[in-house]
Amino acid sequence: MSNHEEEIEELAQRIGKIEVGDTKSDIYQKVLNLIDIERYEHALKIIEKYLGETDAVYERAYCAFQLGKEDFSLEDKQFLQHLQAQKAYRLSDFSKALKIYEHLENDLPEQRADIRVNMLAAASQLPGLQLNNAVSLDDQDSVFNLATRYLTIGDWNQAIELLSSSLEKLENSDSNSEDHKSQINLCRLQLFFAYLQAGDNEKASKESLKISKDCLDETSQAIFVNNLISMSIDNPYISFRDLHGTNLEKALSSLLASQKKQFIRNLALLDMAVGKQRSVRKEKKRNPEESIYFSTILLREETKSLISPKKLPGYLENLFKSDSDNIVVALLLMQHKISNGNFRGALSIYQKLRTSLEASQSLSVLYSPGLVGLGDALHYKIQSTGFKSQLLHEAANYWRKQQSCEAKLLLCTRSLLAHLDERAPVSTIQDDMSVIDDLLQWKGPISELVSCKVAALCYLDKEIESGMDKYLVPTKDLITGIDVDDIEIRGVPVSAAIGPIKRSVEANSSNSSKKTRKRRKPTPKSFNPKATPDPQRWIPKRDRTNVKIKSKGKSMQGGVA
């Protein structure tokens, strides 16, 4: 147990200690204090032991929910839905959180304003989702969430403009409360991040100097230091000291799942920069879902000890033989063979890795988009004629049975397009379209899904649904700045052509550019096929009777005639 955890435990024992003479209100206040420091188990024990069934009902349900226990005795089901939405948001399942908030908006019209703020917070993390309701720019929380949405879709200028105007309003306010100061610094922190993403390090540095760390909570402090490190890491030891000077354990427990994943990766890179390989190995055991990432940075450090780079292939071969399901080693070995043009060798490594992953039931890794794409590319290199994306379709069949995720989005869309190219049966296309519809409900009408659905509808000779055209880029925008007449005259460039079209273009261009040369005759010009052959042609010239030998004169070579 770390020092911080020991301090929290001591604090929990102190503030949660029930003394003689404590009233129900005193005990209730101690329960609230325990919930504030996230000691839900201790708080729930006090509620069950010292308070009645009708006391602290919501606190009881909240603690039970945080501990993974469902409290069905609570009649207020909307309160539980609020908790489920918060949990989904913390786990970065923003689509699920948004659906729950939509139900709550219909069931609780009196709380519609607050619920819409939460809905905007969840929608801001979904880049393909269209915002149906207009956002009020008078509400600071709504403006902050809208700016976060612009950051998600990469519109840095809009985010900077919104955050700057919001910051100006907050600074002109007369309030001097701690919450107000915290809100100003939080807005500055987001503006600092927006400048970083836009590549304006000068303004980002100026904004960082205005942030008061004392007014930020522990999680925001860790994020602030992490952003400072990403702006400049001249001395990794100072960066390591500054980051570990914050309460990392508290920050990691409060971050969203997607933020926590990136934060753990940054910490591992910083540990490697200061030579703390042992701590990285410990983190690898704590986070098995990130084992591939940790193995990569550890292996990169291990290979530095090799005397010569020529020993690297043998080193990787030995590692792969000892651990055939080590994905990092297998990928490095395949990369080395591909760079040398040995595609069959790379494919054999891939097949061995596939066998190992199937034996260990690591199907989520086996059917990950990167590995599937690599396997398909290797098969295509070796068998280009009559190639079908069998690996891609296998992976898509696996992911379509799983919950909606990025891997399902990537592979199922590509599988549908591959089926269209392969002229698959109508039933197969319809099955693929049902998965696309599920993904549209999860991710929203993003361009990949809309284009796939439109392509499938055209293949099935069906009308495109009304309303989908607004998510497609108009043709006039696609051809802006392009001379269509010139392209029609010149033809399709080889670099832009795909598959059989490219091969036919190359064949036509090669035939037209070649000059026809006359074939040289196998006989000399003076050759007469009707002439009688010389019977002495096989005898040396000096021995022939029909050849006059040149006589040698007494005069010197080059003399006067």
Curated annotation (Swiss-Prot):
GO cellular component, one term: nucleus
Bias-annotated ranges (Basic residues): 514-523
One Gene Ontology molecular-function label: 7S RNA binding
Annotated SUPFAM superfamilies: TPR-like
Region annotated Disordered, chain positions: 505-561
Keyword line: Cytoplasm, Endoplasmic reticulum, Membrane, Nucleus, Ribonucleoprotein, Signal recognition particle
Pfam families with a match to the protein in the record: SRP72
GO BP field: SRP-dependent cotranslational protein targeting to membrane
Cellular compartments annotated: Cytoplasm; Endoplasmic reticulum membrane; Nucleus, Nucleolus
InterPro entries: Signal_recog_part_SRP72_RNA-bd, SRP72, TPR-like_helical_dom_sf
Record carries keyword Amino-acid biosynthesis: no
Family (UniProt): Belongs to the SRP72 family.
Subunit structure: Component of a fungal signal recognition particle (SRP) complex that consists of a 7SL RNA molecule (scR1) and at least six protein subunits: srp72, srp68, srp54, sec65, srp21 and srp14.
Record's protein name: Signal recognition particle subunit srp72
